[in-house]
Design a protein with these regions (language model features):
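A structural preference for short, pocket-lining loop segments at secondary-structure junctions
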Residues: 1-8, 22-36, 60-64, 181-184, ...
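Short acidic/His/Gly/Ser-rich catalytic and metal-binding motifs that mark active-site loops
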Residues: 1, 68, 77, 192-196, ...
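Conserved active-site and cofactor/substrate-binding residues in soluble primary-metabolism enzymes
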Residues: 11, 15, 82, 127, ...
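Amphipathic alpha-helical segments at domain termini/boundaries
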Residues: 49-53, 83, 92-204, 208, ...
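Short beta->alpha connector loops at strand-helix junctions that form conserved
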Residues: 39-40, 60-63, 123-126, 285-287
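Hydrophobic, small-residue-rich alpha-helical packing segments that form membrane-like cores
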Residues: 2-30, 34, 40-56, 61-112
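Active-site-proximal loop/turn and secondary-structure-junction residues that shape catalytic pockets
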Residues: 41-43, 239-241, 287
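Conserved small/polar residues in nucleotide/adenosyl-binding loops
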Residues: 288-293
Length: 294
């Protein structure tokens, strides 16, 4: 796939995959989630990079399963996706071993993978299923997330694309190809903020900060992948600042409630994605009623 892709697509692909791994590690650090990578077979290239983002890597000892960076002979790992950084800085693999590992298309198996710190646990094939289940249960028991809480279903985004306009319920994108810019308009909340985290959770995916984060994230990814010639993104907002501050206060005052925490983390990931998008970013304050209320 990548051999037939443009350079720009490769850059966006690698950036997106690394942002995904960063989100996994951020969830482990702040969200009470733990990720377990159970490798039975070959984890090569991006497959092993995904495993590196996990908190614990298990490998079956069957003389065939292996981990590697190169996916095939003469196909090396793509740079700037965090692989070498994770094995050296996160897993504390010796740099000389990391250099050798990066050249081995056949990968590293069994006891050698464990000794090189490329995995955390080597498991005999005869006990693989039971050990993975037991390890997953032990890791899950470490979480502070409520056992009886009901999740919030995330429905499809209300999204329409017509010509140079991309519209969501809360976000609008208008593209000016002559000037090479995209204007992103954020619509503030129409209703006052809920007074409790439970009331916010009851709103589900219609809760304004959650809905905004999802739509804005989707819009930025659309601009990254589908509009490579747009070099400037202008952000505008419309709405009532006092109403917005009510939502801000709710998120600020209840950081330990699981739903509020997840919304805050979603917004953080989205803003980081915007910050790392290779476009010039401008906020048009003159047209912003939200900011004028501060």
């Amino acid at each position: 796939m990548l051999s037939q892709s443009s350079h720009g697509h490769k850059v966006n692909f690698c950036k997106f995959t690394n942002e995904t791994r960063n989100a996994i590690e951020d969830a482990t650090a702040h969200s009470g989630q733990t990720y377990l990578a159970a490798v039975s077979g070959s984890a090569a290239g991006g497959g092993y990079e995904l495993a590196l983002a996990a908190d614990h890597i298990m490998l079956v000892d069957d003389r065939n399963s292996a981990v590697s960076f190169p996916e095939a002979p003469l196909l090396a790992v793509l740079p700037a996706t965090g692989g070498l950084t994770r094995i050296v800085d996160k897993r504390k693999v010796r740099r000389d071993l990391a250099d050798v590992f990066s050249t081995l298309e056949e990968g590293v198996k069994g006891r050698r993978a464990l000794e090189w710190r490329l995995i955390d646990e080597l498991v005999p094939k005869s006990s693989w299923g039971a050990r993975v289940t037991a390890r997953a249960a032990a890791l899950a028991n470490r979480s502070d997330r409520p056992d009886q809480a009901e999740g919030v279903p995330l429905g499809p985004l209300e999204r329409s694309l017509a010509g140079d306009r991309l519209n969501y319920r809360l976000v609008g994108v208008e593209i000016d190809r002559t000037r090479g810019l995209a204007t992103v308009t954020i619509r503030g909340p129409a209703e006052p903020a809920p007074t409790t985290p439970e009331a916010a959770q009851a709103q589900g995916d219609r809760f304004w900060p959650l809905a905004l984060g999802r739509e804005l994230d989707d819009a930025i990814l659309h601009l990254r992948f589908n509009e490579p010639e747009i070099g400037l993104i202008v952000f505008r907002s419309v709405g009532d600042g006092a109403t917005l501050l009510g939502y801000d206060a709710l998120l600020h005052e209840h950081p330990d409630h699981w739903f509020v925490r997840e919304v805050r983390l979603l917004l953080k990931r989205t803003l980081k994605r915007i910050d790392l998008t290779s476009r010039s970013l401008i906020t048009d304050r003159k047209s912003t009623r939200l900011n004028s209320s501060h």
